Amino acid sequence: MGARPLTLLRALLLPLLAGAQAAIVFIKEPSSQDALQGRRALLRCEVEAPDPVHVYWLLNGVPVQDTERRFAQGSSLSFAAVDRLQDSGAFQCVARDNVTGEEVRSTNASFNIKWIEAGPVVLKHPASEAEIQPQTQVTLRCHIDGHPRPTYQWFRDGTPLSDDQSTHTVSSRERNLTLRPASPEHSGLYSCCAHNAFGQACSSQNFTLSVADESFARVVLAPQDVVVARNEEAMFHCQFSAQPPPSLQWVFEDETPITNRSRPPHLRRAVVFANGSLLLTQVRPRNAGVYRCIGQGQRGPPIVLEATLHLAEIEDMLPFEPRVFIAGDEERVTCPAPQGLPTPSVWWEHAGVPLPAHGRVHQKGLELVFVTIAESDTGVYTCHASNLAGQRRQDVNITVATVPTWLRKPQDSQLEEGKPGYLHCLTQATPKPTVIWYRNQMLISEDSRFEVSKNGTLRINSVEVYDGTLYRCVSSTPAGSIEAQARVQVLEKLKFTPPPQPQQCMEFDKEATVPCSATGREKPTVKWVRADGSSLPEWVTDNAGTLHFARVTRDDAGNYTCIASNEPQGQIRAHVQLTVAVFITFKVEPERTTVYQGHTALLRCEAQGDPKPLIQWKGKDRILDPTKLGPRMHIFQNGSLVIHDVAPEDSGSYTCIAGNSCNIRHTEAPLLVVDKPVMEDSEGPGSPPPYKMIQTIGLSVGAAVAYIIAVLGLMFYCKKRCKAKRLQKQPEGEEPEMECLNGGPLQNGQPSAEIQEEVALTSLGSGPPATNKRHSAGDRMHFPRASLQPITTLGKSEFGEVFLAKAQGVEEGATETLVLVKSLQSRDEQQQLDFRREVEMFGKLNHANVVRLLGLCREAEPHYMVLEYVDLGDLKQFLRISKNKDEKLKSQPLSTKQKVALCSQVALGMEHLSNNRFVHKDLAARNCLISAQRQVKVSALGLSKDVYNSEYYHFRQAWVPLRWMSPEAVLEGDFSTKSDVWAFGVLMWEVFTHGEMPHGGQADDEVLADLQAGKARLPQPEGCPSKLYRLMQRCWAPNPKDRPSFSEIASTLGDSPADSKQ
């Protein structure tokens, strides 16, 4: 290849290689901006790089040192108070790669600093006051300066000068006032004020112009502003001259004249002297204000001079944060001087001695300066501020940090499995070092397995086999860090892996195996023996710990022992009881059934097995409890389910679950409730011929008669059988229960007419019409207000009052029922819509873990929503009581298994709610109810006005549960099932902390800021398994799409073992 192609190739590759090495990228560069003198400002700089980078700032090419006023905040530069002199110039953000040394600089950024500064009014022309004569030109200059250039306004004796250019001209550019020609009428006190984008300032010293005219009053001595302490005296001096002598009068703000004969009530101690001076003794706050001295000559206008009396005051000083510095650096601490009048004087002291103006440690202005800080400078320094009103002081604790030194390094260790293990990391330094531990280069966070003590020792509460690895401890202070590592070898204990289940089942007449394995420091020998010491039958073999039954017999049942042993650790035993069982099979399985509305449905289910199986039904996503089914449903002893007076909402999938101590099986079938078709009286043109109709009727009747005969035969047989059983089992005088024989119910030994009719409906045959006994939903929900007897008020919600009441006849079979009543007392349209939304939600939901809507009172205002209530009240109070230290109030402590069960029930209720396309919006422990049987129901008490007011935050004209809300719900008003999932994660955290307030150490505004920044996370509760905390964290995923569904949550909680630590 020639030289020219090589040159071209090199020219193409070099930019690519250079681009590949430029790993540092500015995500946000500083930009020039406006700033106000003495106000806060921030130059932002954000860097992205694969390696650690060091970010610092330059001002006009010189590195910027941190001070109290100007300091680095992360990678940005923060200004507590912008200074137009010290902060003028070009700032640059510089990022240096600590690994490669690469350095990247941002573009220049500067401040356009806006300011205004007061100054005096001075005579510019003529050269001196003595040269001022009538008819001469007089020019005054206002020495107020600022940026941008201010606009000026001139005053004579406190009155703004008009724009009349015949007597004077104003030059804003030169800041001049020119009087041409000057006359006695121009005499007076001249002042100026100016304003710009920063603010306004007035002249600090005014000019008294006196143009000679003996009859005009001229100022000889003008009063000055006075600042005095409370109860001290104040003196104003004021003199005029004229021929004849002028009059002089003092007035206060309310224009009331002050004389020695007549004084205002609040100036009883005022004295006016013959020379015109005004004395105020024992000054009170009410005496502060503007005093005017008015001089009037024989001719000319009156001259009004003003002076203000201020009471001295001084504010409290802001406290210091403790400061930690590194030896050898230059450090500065600025004293936050308090506001005061007059301006307080500030000085620093150390050990009661004021600091000098020069030296290694000295005071410069408000700053405490350490030219080169040393370890001996550690101590308490005091900033003092003082004026006429008193003195203030604040201490700052300064610590000079040192690099840690070793007291005891971690050592390679052998730790026994299952016992506590310790690794020591003992160091000393100033301040006390911070110690962190790493396991396999991964940071160890404290949880139920690991603890780091205050002296740096790592405790492994229960050593596991996989804890055998490399550990590293790092001890650090701001001055630096040291580290050391140690390897842990775990001495494994002799144990079964896994322990055999103490009770196991084998299927009769089938092949079966029972495994048993163990591990230890040396591989153990594993064998099986019968518990009674007898030898194993010849058809049973023991193959290295696996018990093999070629064909299980009844005699194989019994107690067996697995023995594992090795030489150094001895032996361990596990006892197993083997049961020989006939696994469950279904004799009769439920079939797809179609039933007319208002009729009776029969779902047959029979199972067999040994031990005899028990049958349960599951319908509409909940287990049907035989004791709580109500009059419409009944489960017979043989397992069949009958539903009377069926309604469309009974449609759905029904599951028959058969189980015994050895196995469980289930089968399901759908139930469809349809409207009964209307039969036409007259034949249409398409009607079948008469003989076809007769043939159809004959076949139908014949089939029905045959079926009835078969059913009656079975009923007669089963009736005798059941009567015999009842005679054997039932106590004397007990009423026989309704039973079901192969799906046919009996009442007092007679077949039910409803069941006979149901048979025809199931097969969609024609039968006699039946009256639908169900009322419309609106009629069914109406409940008379007179049947409610209020008991006690629970609190107030956004809608209105929430109270407990006794409701008469609200539930079938109960005379009185304890209910929760929510009233709608608000006129707000949105709250009325929300009230109707809750009514619709609880009216449509039907789940064991969601409260039921029992009735509505709408015949008068306020409207009432009558909801189901349970005996122990809301879950929040229950959790708090379970943690209460008062033994009289404390309930049984909650185990991890019970906490998981509580969360699982809420998840099941929310799964049902979300499957029906509803969003709760306020899911929390306070809005769930719990019974004495620990059954939890999702509700919506919403006691935001009083009881739980602290758990709500007023945001955008509404009270919201801020600490339970997802970022998109708070900031965008986007409520969804995924925002309910976020709230469920917080509810789980409440359960495991026994009802603590989420983010309890933060104010509402801080929680809102964390939500906006995406940092709102709750810590892992004490004793909470890591697996469950990871589930909480998934619920708090920033992206709603990354959060689990309630179905997944319910499944995860259902699979969680009570003692899970992973």
UniProtKB/Swiss-Prot annotation:
PTM sites of type Phosphoserine: 1056
Principal subcellular localisation of the protein: membrane
Covalent S-S links between cysteines: 45-93, 142-192, 238-293, 335-383, 425-473, 516-562, 605-656
Record has Transcription regulation as a keyword: no
Entry note about domains: The protein kinase domain is predicted to be catalytically inactive.
Regions that span the bilayer: 697-717
Similarity comment: family membership: Belongs to the protein kinase superfamily. Tyr protein kinase family. Insulin receptor subfamily.
Source organism per UniProt: Mus musculus (Mouse)
Site (Cleavage) location in chain: 613-614
Lineage: superkingdom: Eukaryota
Expressed in which tissues: Expressed at high levels in lung and un-pregnant uterus among adult tissues, and in the tail, limbs, somites, gut and craniofacial regions among embryonic tissues.
Record note on modification: MMP14 cleaves PTK7 between Pro-613 and Leu-614 generating an N-terminal soluble (70 kDa) fragment and a membrane C-terminal (50 kDa) fragment. Proteolysis by MMP14 regulates PTK7 function in non-canonical Wnt signaling pathway.
Region (Interaction with CTNNB1): 786-1062
Keyword Ribonucleoprotein: no
Sequence ranges on the Extracellular membrane side: 23-696
Cytoplasmic face of the membrane: 718-1062
Name of the featured protein: Inactive tyrosine-protein kinase 7
Pfam families the record matches: I-set (PF07679), Ig_3 (PF13927), PK_Tyr_Ser-Thr (PF07714)
Domain Ig-like C2-type: residue ranges: 23-112, 120-210, 217-309, 301-399, 404-489, 495-578, 570-672
Record localization: Membrane; Cell junction
Record PROSITE patterns: IG_LIKE (PS50835), PROTEIN_KINASE_DOM (PS50011), PROTEIN_KINASE_TYR (PS00109)
One biological process term in Gene Ontology: cell migration
